[in-house]
Structure formats: C-alpha cells, structure tokens
Amino acid sequence: MIASKKVRYPDLRKVEIYVLDDGDREEIALIAKELNVKYIRRDNNENAKAGNLNNALKETKGNLVVTLDADMVPRVDFLEKTVGYFEDSKMGFIQAPQTFFNNDPYQFNFFSEKNLNNDQDFFMRRIENQKDIYNSVMYIGSNAVFRRAALESIGGFSTGVITEDLATGMFIQAKGWKTRFVNKNLASGLAPENFSDLIKQRDRWSRGNIQVARKWLPLKIKGLNKVQKLLYMDGIHYWFSGIYKMIFMLAPLWFVLFGFYSLNARFSGILTFWLPSFIASQLAFNRVSQGTQSILLTNIYETVMAPFISYSVISDAVLKSKKGFTVTNKGYNTNKKYYNWRLSLPLLIILFFSIIALCKSIFVIFNILPFESGKDAIYINAFWLLYNVFILIFAVLVPFERPRFRKSERFLSSKEAQLLDKESHLIIDCKVMDWNELGAGITIECNNKIELKEEQKIILSVNGYELESVIRRIIPKKGGTNIGLIFTSLNYEQYAYLITQTYAVASSELPIREEKGNNIGKLLFDIFKGHFILKKK
C-alpha cells in the first residue's frame, strides 16, 4: 500500500488506491484507514479474484484500472512507464512482466541464486515479448493497466474459471482492442518459496488453462485472427507437456525392462524425422531465449513438474474435476532443512527404475545379458535412459528444502551513510551494503578499532533520515568492519523511504543485471559446492 502511494504521476489527484478485500479482514481495513487508502469490502468470495475485481469496477470510476496482486509491489515509475501508451484510443491493456524479489525453489535449492534466473522469467520476459508482435500478449493477472472501456466491452473480468486472466485478455483482443507488453521490471512480488507451494501454483495454472479451453476454446472465439488463435492454443497446449514428458521418461523403461514397444521403427527412420525437428527446435529456442535459458535446464524444470502437471491436466481435461481457486502461500521462512519425500516419491521411483533399465542396457550392449529384440534396439533406448537419469538426478534435488532465515528479502545498496550515537553525534561514516524495512547490513572502511558492541543502540543516518537501530552482529574484515543492524522504531516517512529505496526503487535504478545466462556447468558446481558446505555446517 505504501509503495502504491509513492508511485509518481504528474497529477496525483487523479490517482486513487483501493484495497479489495473479500475475506472481511478487520486488520486490513484498519491499515487502509491509517494509510488513507480506500477500502472495498465484499461479503463473499464468489468467483474468487475475478469476482473481487468486478465488484471493485462497480465501486470505482477511473478511466484506467491497474491490477496488482496483494504481494506485488509497484515501483515508483510504474505509471510513468505505462500510462502514455493509452494516448492510442484503441489501446485496451498494457502488461508488464511479473518479477520477484526472492529466489524460487529452483534457484534456492540448487544453491544457484547468482547463476539462475527465476524459472518464470523465460515466459514473462521472452515469450510475452514475442507475443506482443502479434497483439497476443497474455494478461497474467497482475502488473497490468486496463482501459475501463475495454473491460466494459467484454462485461468485466471473466469468471467461471480459476485463471480469469487468460480469458480476460483474450476477449479484449477479440473485441479489436490493441495490447502491449512493456518489458520493464515495474512491479515485483514473491515467488513460491518451497516445492510444495510451487506445485500448488502450477496445479492452479494448469487447471485454469484447461478450464478456459473447455469453456472458451480459442479456435472458436470470433474476433481473434489466425495467429492469435494459434498462440493462445499454444499456451494452453503447453500444459500437456507434462504428459509428453512422462511418456518420454517411461517409454525406454517399458521397452528395456518389459519389452513393450512405444514406437516400432528403424534407427535410420527415427533420425530422419527426429534430428531435423530437434535441430529446428533448438535453434528456435536459442533465438527466443537469447542466451538466458538452456534446453537442459528447461528439461529439468519440466521433469520436476511432469508427474504433478500430468495429474492436474488429466483430472481437469478428462475427469473434469471441480477443484476451485487456491491462493499460493508466500513469505515462507524456516531455520530447518528437510527433504520432501512425499512429493519427491514419483521422481525417485522413475529414477530408480531408469537406473535399473540403464544397467540392463549396458549388460546387453556388452553381451552379458541376452535381449530378444537385439542390440540395435537397445542403443537408442540406452541413450535416452542415460539422458533421463542425468536430468532426474537434478530433479530429485529440488525437493531438498534449505533453511530460509530472513523474514524479508534484502536489497543491494551502495548508499553513503553515517552511524550516530543516541544524541545524534557522529560516530563514523559507513556505506549500506544491503537493507530492507527491517534492518541493514553496513560496512565501515577503517583500520582503527571502533568502539561498538553487539546490542548497542545507535542511529543509521541515510539521506537525512535517522533510523533508530540496534547492532545485532559485528564481523571484522580486512581493512574494516561489517555490521548487521535491526531497525527498532520507524515512523511513516522513514518506513516509506525504505520501501522506495528497496522494493519500489525505480526500474531504471535497479542495482544489478536482472537476467543471467543460465549455465548448466555453473549449476553443477553450485549444487555440489552447496550440498558439501551445508553438510559440513
């Protein structure tokens, strides 16, 4: 809420902020009142999020409507970077990518926070950008600005499915409105922080896409052109990839262990059809990803999710289950490490039998064991078994949950600051290394001994703001000292300043390169180093 109040706009009298609450939470109403933010309460949660948004449309009047999930924090330049597009009278909505402050389970549990992108970045920053060329940008539920007239032309946000966003954007485009994707980090939130919550989120997304296809098949939507229909069908079809991945993993097992054929063809015939397809898909993938994603890493992600997404898709597409909307838990922290055996069991079983099948293949190749179908049939299956085992080893490491100690994410900084005593007298100059609304890490470049001690009350002075703090940790280093601080008493202006310098900092002022080139070699090194260090500790 505070970040929304700090968003820049030429005439802030035209900006109204609303908190939409369909859970009747009195504490939320009190916070909204304290911050002078308008509060819209709904007595029920009919149609979940879409119903909540539609209810708010009836209570508001603005020509432009921004939708933000509760965990999404807009940057101060959000409106500056989006509203200008609506000078085009046919512009229906603007979509910015969802980005995240924290590390997802892949980044965190692989010990590869510095070398891996968030697994959603490929879609959010690359695929959406390509869809923009064909006016097929998908509305992703948050970080978007709508023209009210566009929403009214389709009767408001689509209801009756658990992913209202996909259908809403599709219908707006079908009405002839233009849409744009602004590929800038304009609002960030929290990604799922453990394997269980990640599965819940993807379960909801997959079921929602299937529900959209059952209720409003894109191929039959009047107003969409052929390319738009194809791209929407492709987005829905993606969720069936879990089934394909399961077949891909199980087919070599069926053949090597039980002699079941999934494909009866000569090796030369397979190469004739498969090799050109593989090369073409690899080139296309590299073109779209622009070095920020790899095929191997994508296969790891898809393998991890395959058993669960397959179940979700079959449940909704075939069995037509009635599972409703569920909210993904955010803000998870724990000081424990554990392995999620229950959720990893399907992957462990497939890995176990893949290793057995691979060993049998090797014995057949070296004439230790006979094989009715002959050795020629074994070679290609042995290759895919080896590949699957390699991928599955990575996959079964994802449910290994590391401790998450911090209650809030820290943000890098290089701001000059000063440490003051309780009477605001200067102790020494310092620099902020990282901080959030709860505390800060600072560094002092000084060879002389500093008379500071843990639990001492001091003041951190930054840009005119004097932040009352307590020293929690002092770590000597060569040529200076690193100090960990906890803020003890912040007024509104101080708290708002910290928010604008951390969560809501302008997109142009982000201190680090947002996208990294995913590298499987670095990932291997990170995993082995991380598990060795964690075990040692």
Region annotations inferred by a language model:
Residues I2-K14:
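Short, acidic, metal-binding catalytic loop of nucleotide-sugar glycosyltransferases
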Residues L20-I28, N44-N45:
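A conserved acidic beta->alpha catalytic loop
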Residues I40-L64, V76-I162, A174, F195-I236, ...:
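Long helical/loop segments within the catalytic core of UDP-sugar-dependent glycosyltransferases
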Residues D69-V73:
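The conserved acidic donor/metal-binding loop of glycosyltransferases
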Residues F171-A187:
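Catalytic donor-sugar/metal-binding loop of nucleotide-sugar-dependent glycosyltransferases
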Residues Y338-K537:
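Structured alpha-helical
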